[in-house]
Swiss-Prot record:
Its cofactor is heme. GO terms for cellular component: membrane. It comes from Dictyostelium discoideum. This is Probable cytochrome P450 524A1. Heme binds at residue 478. The keyword Membrane applies. It is found in: Membrane.
Length: 532
């Protein structure tokens, strides 16, 4: 809030207070005088005594009128500020004071999106008294992702939970240096080493689903647990005791709750519990890293992402080594878990539902896998790369149901986007990944689930590359893109070849609910059994 704005609000509030104090004191004049004569006091003390007596004489009506005046003043000022900021940009004709369009965004998100899209590629709105730009055009979205002065905006409590050591809060040269350190963790060799872990955990969980398949299985709940098991397995290795991996999962879920709560850091609050869970995760990872440093120093074979990172560090020539502190590893892992847990869970759930709704596409996946692995051989990267149709299905799942439909940014300086649109400092910018994926003039027939769009004839992965924003763009482009796509492909492959499942629809269950990521409203209930 700029200084003149502060003075304006203070002036109005003081004026309102003066009016009511004056009126109240006039009614109790003699009584107040008598009271102050009986009690000797200093000037300040007498003033306070008068004020206390005056306030005590307010009627309920006066108090209510005062509250109305204050709220009306704030609301009018909010409208004035928004009018100044929006300029000639299109947007809603009226925005409710204080909360803005928050409730529309929460309770009727599709209606909110549709209205904003009709305003054009860039439109304005207001959420919780925050001036917001809603961007639907793919090219302008890319510009926002790449803009150095537009920073990721996670949540009000995110920095308290993850701390400024986490990847989303690192910028400039330190961020580039960290990404350079991370590259060896996503090479072909690294991805190949993670694959057996991913496959074994998927097999284990699908077997449990089949065992419990006589009753409805909720895909969202089960995919959440599966995805967390894979994350902990890849990051710390299956050689880490199961009790430790369970402790990581338990504390992560508590920490994750803190990103959507009120930013009140007091004992017993959700935010404080989230911070305490992060502290516990730091302790767990510190112990795991110490053991990894010893094993890799002894020349043992890497069994996890942490092992690979430590091994690469130890094998670098000393003059090329960057410092590899425990904090660097730990807060990078926490960033990975934060970024991937809900997003990948969303993609796995949509895999289950979309394949149940498109049996013809599922049949083609099965036919391709049967030709590549006739004896149900273990997966390897070479075979997975040959499964072109399966990979097209994965790409279409991510296009058709992008896990995060928008990625909020906040600009730390005045910037210009699109067709010379000036964005004042402190504006929240919402680049809509959903809108980019369904933009007219982008993907052909975008509302149709059609993996064939990515084949060698249509090549929409090339011709519509600008519209694909599921992994972001710019300095924070998802470095784990291939690991994430592999995880979905492994899940799709194993689910398709080892099970038969039916989607048990519920009234309204197919509606999409919006949070940080999207899910079907009922979480997708299925009945599942082993496939002959």
């Amino acid at each position: 809030m700029k200084t003149p704005t502060k003075y304006f609000i203070i002036f109005i509030l003081l004026a309102a207070l003066a009016v009511f104090v004056s009126e109240a004191t006039s009614k109790v004049g003699q009584q107040t005088t008598t009271t102050t004569q009986q009690v000797k006091c200093s000037g300040l003390q007498c003033t306070l005594n008068k004020l206390i007596v005056a306030v005590g004489k307010f009627t309920i009506k006066q108090i209510l009128v005062g509250i109305v005046i204050v709220l009306a003043t704030i609301a009018l000022h909010q409208q004035y500020v928004i009018t100044q900021k929006k300029g000639s940009l299109p947007g809603p004709s009226f925005v409710p004071p204080f909360f803005g369009m928050l409730f529309q965004l929460i309770f009727t998100p599709f209606s909110f999106y549709e209205k904003q899209e009709k305003y054009g590629p860039i439109s304005w709105t207001s959420i919780m008294n925050k001036f917001v730009l809603f961007v639907t055009d793919a090219e302008i979205n890319r510009q926002v992702f790449k803009e150095e002065n537009a920073k990721l905006y996670l949540s009000l409590g995110a920095k308290k939970i993850l701390t400024e050591k986490a990847i989303p809060f690192i910028e400039g040269a330190p961020h580039r240096q960290l990404r350079k350190q991370l590259l060896p963790l996503f090479t072909i060799r690294a991805l190949s080493s993670y694959l057996p872990i991913q496959e074994s955990i998927v097999d284990e969980h699908i077997a449990m689903w089949i065992k419990n398949g006589k009753a409805d299985i909720n895909a969202r709940n089960n995919c959440r647990d599966l995805n967390m098991a894979i994350s902990t397995g890849v990051f710390v290795g299956n050689n880490t005791p199961e009790s430790v991996r369970d402790d990581i999962a338990k504390n992560f879920f508590v920490m994750n709750e803190g990103f959507l709560c009120l930013p009140i850091d007091l004992p017993g609050t959700t935010l404080r519990k989230a911070i305490n869970a992060r502290v516990r995760l730091v302790e767990i990872f510190t112990d795991i890293i110490a053991k990894s440093r010893k094993r890799m120093g002894d020349g043992e074979k890497p069994q996890s992402l942490i092992d690979l990172w430590v091994e690469h560090f130890l094998n670098c020539p000393e003059e090329e080594r960057d410092e590899l502190s425990n904090d660097t590893i730990i807060f990078t892992l926490l960033s990975f878990m934060f970024a991937s847990q809900d997003a990948l869970t969303s993609s796995l759930v949509w895999t289950v539902q979309l394949m149940a709704e498109h049996p013809d596409i599922l049949a083609k996946v099965r036919a391709e896998q049967a030709s590549l692995r006739p004896n149900n051989e273990k997966l390897d990267l070479d075979t997975m790369r040959q499964a072109t149709y399966t990979r097209m299905v994965v790409s279409e799942i991510l296009r058709f149901r992008p896990p995060a439909v928008m990625v909020p940014h906040e600009n730390i300086e005045d910037i210009v986007i699109g067709d010379n649109v000036h964005v004042p400092k402190g504006t929240m910018i919402l680049p809509s990944i959903w809108s980019a994926h369904f933009q007219e003039g982008g993907y052909s027939d975008p509302y149709k689930f059609d993996p064939q769009r990515f084949d060698s004839v249509r090549k929409e992965d090339v011709t519509c590359a600008k519209n694909s924003l599921v992994f972001g763009a710019g300095p924070h482009f998802c470095i784990g893109k291939e690991l994430a796509k592999n995880q979905i492909e492994v899940f799709l492959t194993k689910l398709a070849m080892s099970t038969e499942w039916t989607h048990n629809k519920t009234p309204g269950g197919d509606e999409i609910i919006f949070g940080p990521t999207i899910f079907p409203k009922d979480g997708c209930n299925i009945t599942i059994k082993a496939r002959n």
